[in-house]
């Protein structure tokens, strides 16, 4: 289809005059009886089986529906409320399971021996065997989501509070659903309201993030930290005394509203003695130093960050966000204008010689929600990957670090989410280039210059990928050959030819060299090793006889696998970036923009033109993202088991330096738990391991065969049906080339992820 550049916008009325339109679109339930009502062709109903696939492909592609950018913006905004409603329902279900079916109280009373469980299998056909003995007279399925540890950090001490949260979350879901209906049908914002970016930043940064963080700091200060102090004292065997009564068990704990009483709170933290407002406004802030701390390191009782440090963090971050949210010019005529910043930002004339700098970028971002989404997905995806590292290096929740399946699960989860978001960023960047990019607006600005330099960028990136791939894989092949020939001295290893990661070791040692003391905001702060994280040459954090986190030594094996990471990341980037930079045109297909975001081929000429669409680059990028992150999570799993948790006898340094070592000592040796799981409570992971392998193998049927093969087969099957007068009214059609690839990629990823899920869980739950 032909995509026209967006029309130049007309001079708009001041945004604050009337930002919403009342009763814009009346509620029409009759549409629910018409699948595909947004499209003239789909609304006619199915003539072939292709209809159902097009229905799924286009249901959320609001750009292609009847309507303009304002209508699209309203639909997206309304969908946000629907999304929040689904999240609240999901949270309510978690709270309800915790309240009704879990051993939360039992786990709270003995978190180092009792394992978390929140689901009990009913004995219908004998599957009650799945209910493992988790300790504390509870039999159920062990959970690895980390919610018990998180609830303990929040200050939840009984199931009644969880039930209240479950009901509250359902009420919030109802409010969110109503919000989605209200802001689409009753009070729909105008396009100018959506384009008022400075006000949006003010609302999001100062309001949602800043005030939200300060509000959460308030909860941490008044509920979370006092509860943590009392619970930690119980777990340490040194109960605190409130009003002359020792708080020796959960049953003795004050109720949350009682902790807000200064008379009780001050017995835990004297700074909460009731003069907090006076101390705040007289700047006597040192009075708060008992519940707003800067201790660093981990709480030795729980193996997690100090709750008082977390309170301090959220307060400080919230204040910064409130200030940052007011940097932009809204109704008062002061502050920054994003358009002025971008239009005036030219950059260094030698390094960045684009004559028009960032002119036109503001208009692109203010009119293309795909461009906005691309940027936001790239940033939040990267943030998710950063979070995956923080969760083990600086465990935020009590007793999280000694729950190994949960630590591995959280790392893996945040890695997958980050990877999917980053690929999604490339997808929406490609859509933005095709649907929203107007070449006339971008003449010799940074975006235009990057597009003009795309051949240099892609060819150099291709060289980097080849260099990294051949060299890093070559190190492994060399080691396999040397080990096969019995020549260990000629291997790249810590005991042979060393390839030490000197830069990474230097970063780890920075924290040691900074040890001593310094003055921070007038207070003397000790900078001991492990102040930031124990992984940086700190000390071993042990809780209940289990290692939570410890210094992580880096050597030749890490140097080698990190260069495999570099290789897979660069190849993923190469594919995704090529899909964006060549989304509109290429030497092979100069008019690519006219073909749209997804198309299978551009005809049989030129020696073949398939898999060149921006969508196909996302398709290929997903496989490399999966490939790269599989290596990352395998590396993390083995490294932690070997060098931190002490489960595999420290074999990572010598075994992971060969391909054979990865196959034999990681995949094969560690799959013994899942392969021998039958007859045990973890047997569902054995079934899942098999089933997910099947789903993965099923994907190959879609990926390895072309559409024509299946259409030929269908013709024969339809002929047979016609002979028997059983011809269907809706004509069967083979999946289109693009649809087949989408189904194949989905099953490949889901099968692979679920296989890994079963492998990891069975391994660490099976080891106990």
Swiss-Prot record:
User: Which terms in the GO cellular component ontology are assigned?
Assistant: photosystem I; plasma membrane-derived thylakoid membrane
Cite the binding residues for [4Fe-4S] cluster. Answer: 601, 610
EC identifiers of the protein: 1.97.1.12
* Gene from which this protein is expressed: psaA
Residues bound to phylloquinone:
710
Name the record gives this protein: Photosystem I P700 chlorophyll a apoprotein A1
Q: Which family does it belong to?
A: Belongs to the PsaA/PsaB family.
Q: How many and how are cofactors bound here?
A: PSI electron transfer chain: 5 divinyl chlorophyll a, 1 divinyl chlorophyll a', 2 phylloquinones and 3 4Fe-4S clusters. PSI core antenna: 90 divinyl chlorophyll a, 22 carotenoids, 3 phospholipids and 1 galactolipid. P700 is a divinyl chlorophyll a/divinyl chlorophyll a' dimer, A0 is one or more divinyl chlorophyll a, A1 is one or both phylloquinones and FX is a shared 4Fe-4S iron-sulfur center.
According to the record, the segments passing through the membrane are: 76-99, 162-185, 201-225, 310-328, 369-392, 408-434, 456-478, 559-577, 617-638, 682-704, 742-762
